[in-house]
């Protein structure tokens, strides 16, 4: 399991794609990994300030949103099928959006 891989997980509202955003060392060997939830619905609007648009290049079947305003810690055993890996440019967008959404850019 590696940072920036896309898996399926059920966080309590049905199976959705999720992105591992843990430090690579944590993603590789710790019991808990940090993830961002992604929409399972096809994106049919522009992304909100807390979202990044992802698509087939990231292992998804259609364009969808990665929600960057809430980081979840879940047991790695809760992650299901691997869907793909987030592209480098999209990783940069996600990191910028997480920082801005949490207000860390003003520190």
Which role fits each region the language model picked out?
Residues 57-107:
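C-terminal terminal-subdomain/extension
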């Amino acid at each position: 399991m590696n940072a920036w891989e896309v898996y399926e997980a059920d966080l309590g509202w049905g199976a959705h794609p999720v992105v591992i955003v843990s430090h690579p060392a944590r993603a590789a060997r710790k019991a808990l990994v940090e993830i961002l939830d992604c929409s399972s619905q096809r994106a049919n609007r522009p992304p909100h300030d807390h979202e990044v648009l992802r698509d087939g290049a990231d292992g998804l079947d259609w364009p969808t949103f990665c929600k960057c305003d809430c980081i979840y810690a879940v047991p790695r055993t809760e992650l299901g099928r691997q869907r793909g890996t987030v592209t480098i440019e999209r990783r940069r967008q996600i990191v910028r959006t997480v920082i801005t959404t949490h207000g860390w850019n003003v520190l």
